């Protein structure tokens, strides 16, 4: 008689940690969680701390916290002072020298929030990759989430890296984001940039596709239950379709003359449109970071000043951008002490 004895497989520390991280629990951790959870916790904690207690008086000449009387719309974690350049503003660095109060005053919370926020978003993307691999599905959710990551990184990190300092990045707040949008329009003519146009088409197109798709599915649900609505009739494990693709195809064929006949192509298109919009707008922001002026009237104004033969049309768009610059240059960058003589300020139709 032969007795087979199983050899003990030596399990190292990595295997033990891997088992613990991937254990079935209410909130999955995984290897991606080692990046996601600490970074997200620190980024959100820094944002709540900054909007509650920390002033922007020393960086922007503004009150920006609840403690100073701001509300949810006006509170923000403001970007560092222009004089800080592109320093990462470590608490132990030469600027703050370990002084937490000074670190908050010079804008250290902004770099802390931005960097931990970026790594938190990357961790969330990796989390979707990891769980997709474990449950055996495709990783298109993670690929789609690359769009928001591209926008965050390009706007909050790449754009200010191309400018003079972190000062020109958007601060983390509602009104602060709108200020940044005005800045992009006035100094870069952002709305006339084709990459912005593609981004708008992608986001609004994605919203339209989402609304059409949701309404069409609701319209073509099979009546397979006795309840007042069809929600209770659905079971997650049913083998039958929940709605009629054939009916939906006939409906839109009658309306548009063409319709999606393939669910895979339909849903890929719903993925492709908004994600492509996010990526193209991110590419446009990188162009602004490098001060590419192909769609910026400032370059035409400079050329017109140098070349008497060069003509530009003075449009409402030019008037808008000049007005934004005249207002924001002094208000937004008080440390520069800009003074504009009245004769150079735009005067609308009184020209």
UniProtKB/Swiss-Prot annotation:
Membrane spanning residue stretches: 39-59, 123-139, 151-164, 206-226, 277-293
Biological processes per GO annotation: photosynthetic electron transport in photosystem II
Cofactor: record remark: The D1/D2 heterodimer binds P680, chlorophylls that are the primary electron donor of PSII, and subsequent electron acceptors. It shares a non-heme iron and each subunit binds pheophytin, quinone, additional chlorophylls, carotenoids and lipids. There is also a Cl(-1) ion associated with D1 and D2, which is required for oxygen evolution. The PSII complex binds additional chlorophylls, carotenoids and specific lipids.
Enzyme class: oxidoreductase
This protein's name: Photosystem II D2 protein
Disulfide bonds: none
GO CC annotation terms, alphabetical: chloroplast thylakoid membrane; photosystem II
Chain positions recorded as Fe cation binding sites: 213, 267
Misc remark: 2 of the reaction center chlorophylls (ChlD1 and ChlD2) are entirely coordinated by water.
Source organism (scientific name): Galdieria sulphuraria (Red alga)
